[in-house]
């Protein structure tokens, strides 16, 4: 027998009261986007659960995709049948014969919401249990923690059988907590920060600074590939490429070397904040980890943060590098992040950056720049691409990647 659909149980949505259906509908849209590589799938939601109709699509890759979607507590692949006792008996026997191994224990758990059905839950348990013994006389029934708990649900529209429950990713549906701008460099930390923001329901748009010809097309593709990895947790993500060459050249020409990084990061923060304001964002998200590099000391963070009143979320700020790497490996971004393409944070990096920059000094150096003009030109020149989930790359894609 082939699974006909997957029943999805919602996560923290049960706590959301009057907003429950808004959360459920957002989760439905996220599931549809994540499963977009499977064109035959249909998704429908009600207050209790979301139904993913397979329509002939193989179950296994769909289940792998659903495991990552935030807002899902658990899901069950199910067989959908007509409400006919003889059909239920034959189906239960076939399922159990396929599952059976020596020494297996089982339990039938029936639930009837259609009270017009000819058998109540207790009688249905008895009839189906006896049917299993008829074809598997050596199997044993066990009420507590059986090897197989075969769940049979009689609803108004159909009968459903399931025996497997898969744990979901938990968290909140992406987009239910508002929108944030993720400052995505291409390193290890910022994709992990994006993942953690997504988990708490923040819809992210990835802001990436490019400085051609100093940064290569490979660096841009790397950032887009990282963004695509993040789409599996909640659907499509807008990728915003910011032209940053003019600003970096001005900073290099006009500022003391020790302050290059601080000034660069302040410009990045200004530009990200301007993009946020124009796109209805509420926060900025970045991958800063306290003390990891010179621009991530408390003094540096204070000097950089001073250009905006917008909240800046730093999900990995207290994590050790090894903890961040472990998460990067879990979400499958690590191997992309370590590809040897320089980003705009490294191309002009000074040998001895200032670890405790003084705000008054930074502001004095910035008088040498047309800050408003530089920021406006950068924002005006942004390119926006919608990054969507994709099926696994084929051999041709892998060969092309290897050539870059």
UniProtKB/Swiss-Prot annotation:
Residues the record lists as binding ATP: 183-184, 208-209, 265, 287, 296
UniProt-listed SMART domains: THUMP (SM00981)
Classification via InterPro entries: Rossmann-like_a/b/a_fold, ThiI_AANH, ThiI_fer, ThiI_N, THUMP_dom, THUMP_ThiI, tRNA_STrfase, tRNA_sulfurtransferase_ThiI
Family note: Belongs to the ThiI family.
Species: Streptococcus uberis (strain ATCC BAA-854 / 0140J)
Domain THUMP: 60-165
Pathway: Cofactor biosynthesis; thiamine diphosphate biosynthesis
Reactions catalysed according to its record: [ThiI sulfur-carrier protein]-S-sulfanyl-L-cysteine + a uridine in tRNA + 2 reduced [2Fe-2S]-[ferredoxin] + ATP + H(+) = [ThiI sulfur-carrier protein]-L-cysteine + a 4-thiouridine in tRNA + 2 oxidized [2Fe-2S]-[ferredoxin] + AMP + diphosphate; [ThiS sulfur-carrier protein]-C-terminal Gly-Gly-AMP + S-sulfanyl-L-cysteinyl-[cysteine desulfurase] + AH2 = [ThiS sulfur-carrier protein]-C-terminal-Gly-aminoethanethioate + L-cysteinyl-[cysteine desulfurase] + A + AMP + 2 H(+)
Enzyme class: transferase
UniProt-recorded name of the protein: Probable tRNA sulfurtransferase
HAMAP family to which the protein is assigned, alphabetical: ThiI (MF_00021)
Keyword terms of this UniProt record: ATP-binding, Cytoplasm, Nucleotide-binding, RNA-binding, Thiamine biosynthesis, Transferase, tRNA-binding
One annotated GO biological process: thiamine biosynthetic process
Localization of this protein: Cytoplasm
Molecular-function annotations in GO: ATP binding; CCA tRNA nucleotidyltransferase activity; tRNA binding; tRNA-uracil-4 sulfurtransferase activity
């Amino acid at each position: 027998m082939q699974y006909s659909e997957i029943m999805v149980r919602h996560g923290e949505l049960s706590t959301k009261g009057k907003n429950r259906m808004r959360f459920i509908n957002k989760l439905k849209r996220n599931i549809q986007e994540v499963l977009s590589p499977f064109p035959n799938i249909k998704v429908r939601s009600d207050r209790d659960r979301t139904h993913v109709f397979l329509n002939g699509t193989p179950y296994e890759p769909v289940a792998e995709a659903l495991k990552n979607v935030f807002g899902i507590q658990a899901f069950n692949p199910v067989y959908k049948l007509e409400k006919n006792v003889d059909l239920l008996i034959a189906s239960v026997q076939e399922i159990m014969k396929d599952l059976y191994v020596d020494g297996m224990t089982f339990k039938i758990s029936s639930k009837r919401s259609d009270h017009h059905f000819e058998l109540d839950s207790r009688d249905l348990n008895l009839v189906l249990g006896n049917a299993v013994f008829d074809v598997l006389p050596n199997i044993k029934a066990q009420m507590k923690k059986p090897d197989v708990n075969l769940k049979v649900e009689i609803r108004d529209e159909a009968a459903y059988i399931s025996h497997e429950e898969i744990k979901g990713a938990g968290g909140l549906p992406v987009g239910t907590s508002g929108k944030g701008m993720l400052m995505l460099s291409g390193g290890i930390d910022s994709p992990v920060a994006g993942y953690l923001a997504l988990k708490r329901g923040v819809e992210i748009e990835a802001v990436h600074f490019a400085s051609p010809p100093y940064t290569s097309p490979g660096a841009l593709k790397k950032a887009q590939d990282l963004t695509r990895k993040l789409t599996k947790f909640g659907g499509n993500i807008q990728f915003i490429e910011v032209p940053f060459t003019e600003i970096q050249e001005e900073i290099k020409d006009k500022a003391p070397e020790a302050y290059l990084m601080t000034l660069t990061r302040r410009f990045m923060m200004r530009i990200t904040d301007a993009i946020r304001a124009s796109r209805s964002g509420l926060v900025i998200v970045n991958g800063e980890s306290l003390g990891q590099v010179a621009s991530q000391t408390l003094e540096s963070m204070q000097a950089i943060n001073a250009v905006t009143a917008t909240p800046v979320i730093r999900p990995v700020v207290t994590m050790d590098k090894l903890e961040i790497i472990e998460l990067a490996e879990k979400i499958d971004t690590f191997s992309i992040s370590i590809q040897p393409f320089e980003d705009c944070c490294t191309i002009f990096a000074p040998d001895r950056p200032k670890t405790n920059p003084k705000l008054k000094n930074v502001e004095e150096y910035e008088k040498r720049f047309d800050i408003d003009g530089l920021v406006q030109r950068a924002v005006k020149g942004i390119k926006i691409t919608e990054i969507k989930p994709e099926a696994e790359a084929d051999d041709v894609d892998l060969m092309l990647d290897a050539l870059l």
